[in-house]
């Protein structure tokens, strides 16, 4: 078991190196959403109920400098409290980007406008923040770095919309976590690129009713996973299907 654990850690390290995640950087962190993180549900990535989608409470909203117009949705970051004296707690926590922290140009960036460009900032779910700092701190300096996401099961595809407007929510992405591109294929069509509608909702205007559906997902590190015929021909809008994984 010990050898298996070491091999797994080495595998993650190789993934991080291959993706070019880089080293530690400096930012600040605050918290929102309440003690049960119920206020973090929904959000600009489109994940909806973070509990049922498997993201839980280890999540964060990213400032403009990190959010990248939604392209960063699903990426994972390791954070540790940095130089905040008695407010810091030892250790680190890994969070998934699930929301956007909007700028507040009415306040200076060092006094309330924490998410103003070009500041990197994490507005963490309260339970996640309390892993690295005390509640009374309110805001703390942190060190952060991109890390590979670890997920259970395969990439999930929730097919919403209607005929000629297929809106597919892509969730539970391991590895890089974020998604660069998605393609869709019906059993009677070829591969067709989808466009990012918002967050991790991807759009196709093709008529695909009554066809089995396949998906091809490419992450920001260039790796691609193809999930063939994951949705049977009788699929209905609102259903979720599980494919392969990175």
Swiss-Prot record:
Phenotype reported upon loss of the gene: Plants are smaller.
A single cellular component GO annotation: membrane
Signal peptide: 1-18
Gene3D superfamilies, alphabetized: Expansin, cellulose-binding-like domain, RlpA-like domain
Chain ranges of the Expansin-like CBD domain: 164-243
Subcellular location: Secreted, Cell wall; Membrane
UniProt record, GO biological process: plant-type cell wall loosening; plant-type cell wall organization or biogenesis
Induction field: By gibberellin (GA3), submergence and wounding.
Disulfide bonds, paired cysteine numbers: 45-73, 76-149, 81-88
InterPro entries, per the entry: Expan_Lol_pI, Expansin, Expansin/allergen_DPBB_dom, Expansin_CBD, Expansin_CBD_sf, RlpA-like_DPBB, RlpA-like_sf
Superkingdom in the source lineage: Eukaryota
Domain Expansin-like EG45, chain residue ranges per copy: 42-154
CDD domains: DPBB_EXPA_N
Membrane topology recorded in Swiss-Prot or TrEMBL: Peripheral membrane protein
Family from the record: Belongs to the expansin family. Expansin A subfamily.
Function, as annotated: Causes loosening and extension of plant cell walls by disrupting non-covalent bonding between cellulose microfibrils and matrix glucans. No enzymatic activity has been found. Required for normal plant growth. May be required for rapid internodal elongation in deepwater rice during submergence.
Full protein name: Expansin-A4
Taxonomic source organism: Oryza sativa subsp. indica (Rice)
């Amino acid at each position: 078991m010990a050898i298996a654990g070491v091999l797994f850690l080495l595998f993650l390290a190789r993934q991080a190196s291959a993706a070019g995640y880089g080293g530690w950087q400096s930012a600040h962190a605050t918290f929102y959403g309440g003690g049960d993180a119920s206020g973090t549900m929904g959000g600009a990535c489109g994940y909806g109920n973070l509990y049922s989608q498997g993201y839980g409470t280890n999540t964060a909203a990213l400032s403009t400098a990190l959010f990248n117009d939604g392209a960063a949705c699903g990426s994972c970051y390791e954070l540790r409290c940095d130089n905040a004296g008695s407010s810091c707690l030892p250790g680190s926590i890994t969070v998934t980007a699930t929301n956007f922290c909007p700028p507040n140009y009415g306040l200076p960036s060092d006094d309330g406008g924490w998410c103003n460009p070009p500041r990197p900032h994490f507005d963490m779910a309260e339970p996640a923040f309390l892993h690295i700092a005390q509640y009374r701190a309110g805001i703390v300096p942190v060190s952060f770095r991109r890390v590979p996401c670890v997920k259970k099961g395969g990439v999930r595809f929730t097919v919403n919309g209607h005929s000629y407007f297929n809106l597919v929510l892509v969730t539970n992405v391991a590895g890089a976590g974020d998604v660069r591109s998605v393609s869709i294929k019906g059993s009677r069509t070829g591969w067709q690129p989808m466009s990012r509608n918002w967050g991790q909702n991807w759009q196709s205007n093709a008529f695909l009713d009554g066809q089995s559906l396949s998906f091809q997902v490419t992450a920001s590190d260039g790796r691609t996973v193809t999930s063939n015929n994951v949705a049977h021909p009788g699929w209905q809008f609102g259903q979720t299907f599980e494919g392969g994984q990175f």
